[in-house]
Amino acid sequence: MTENTPVPVITVSNLIKQFGRFAALRGVTAEFSGGKLYAILGDNGAGKTTLLRTLAGLNQPSSGHISILGSSKFHDICQQVGYMAHPSLLYDEMSGMENLDYFARLYGITSRERCAEVIRAVGLDPDLVRPVGQYSQGMKQRMSLARALLNNPKILLLDEPFSNVDTHSATEMVRLLARTRDQGKTLFIVTHQASLLEGAADEFVWMESGKIVGRTRELKRPESHGESAGGNLTGGNLK
């Protein structure tokens, strides 16, 4: 690695995740640089969410190696990563502030000002008292993002943040995520609405059958490499 080569924030090597006899990830090897927005694309069953959950420490790899910001320890990874699940993990009967206060305590954060800060950061009002169950889908997604930002992570892993959101709200969410990237965070976004990220994503990462089969700077699906791909693509393999 030369002086001008960016140090990867995430490195995965021969990553395999099996559920019984089914291999959801099949030997993924890749490096990802920091301060970028990566769109993770592919058909249903390609392994996108499994990769995201495994990077977040929610899935134990069957084999292989993950290093996030130089560490492979689960505790260190949890401190550096924010995860936005699909569907969102919010309590409908609680207000947004109550939700964030609850999850903040799980991180050992006792300052309600931190909760208010992340709510404002996603464009919502911390004084909003009605239950989350009465929020629009766009507001719920913003609140889920606020939850992911609570521990001020350097890396955000977002699963379908535009799901069931109207076009205007989705566009506003993209702008918010781009600003978050511009503040120095690294974002990985799984989505089936790739066109929303055209012009915002730094890189499109294409998955197929549990492997990374291509990485492009433009929203153009690479030719399928089939079994020969091996998921072995690093940050330099861009088209």
Per-region residue spans from a language model:
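Conserved ABC ATPase "signature" region
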Residues: D101, R112-D127
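H-loop/switch region of ABC-family ATPase nucleotide-binding domains
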Residues: T191-H192
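Helix-to-loop junction immediately C-terminal to a conserved catalytic motif
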Residues: A56
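Catalytic Walker B motif of ABC-type/P-loop ATPase nucleotide-binding domains
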Residues: L156-D159
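The feature captures the beta-strand-to-loop junction immediately N-terminal to the Walker
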Residues: L41-D43
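Conserved ABC transporter NBD signature motif
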Residues: G64-I77
